């Protein structure tokens, strides 16, 4: 995960001080890309311990089309708590857009099922895309989508994915995002009888919050370790039938966790 540390160094060296929605302040660059060959290991940051339970449960929550934090709280995942209302609702965030995008004529489009069918029936299509950026519903969302748009690509029997992330919290959020989409690629590949290819991450406003600088400097003193391996223990009937227990990470030997405040 040297690419991740290189990005941190780039933001520190080249970033522009900017105000932001949270009032915290950032150092920011615009436009950055990283490529991870998923054949070479699972891209889970090793220079600090990442909370894999949260990553897996959040993705399963998205895949279920859920937009209430009850499932997350039942599984001791608190990453969305700050944005939920008193009933645990978040509005039409990722799960709603991925599984039930509303159309002007009242239909709902299950983008993930559509994409799965495309991968199986027309893998050379250039339209294998999922978008969470629903302009008509942004004002109803507790938080506008940060990881907004992703595209799949099949070549030589391998499935690759590119994500466009319009806003990226490099210290706290990005390790989660990389691991989450890498996990999704593995799941989609298994369902489509493909090997995994690359995960390509593309960032828009890519920033370090001003109250993450000490933590960033600490992380940059640490040497990356070997990437772990993802094992999926069974092949469920569909993409939407995976359970937390289906996933195992082998050989994850991270440096200790580094705590930092979330900008809300």
From Swiss-Prot:
GO terms for biological process: dTMP biosynthetic process; dTTP biosynthetic process; methylation. Keywords: Cytoplasm, Methyltransferase, Nucleotide biosynthesis, Transferase. The active site is at 146 (nucleophile). PANTHER family: THYMIDYLATE SYNTHASE, THYMIDYLATE SYNTHASE 1. Homodimer. This is Thymidylate synthase. Its EC number is 2.1.1.45. It is found in: Cytoplasm. HAMAP family: Thymidy_synth_bact (MF_00008). Its main location: cytoplasm. DUMP binds at residues 21, 126-127, 166-169, 177, 207-209. One of its GO terms (molecular function) is thymidylate synthase activity.
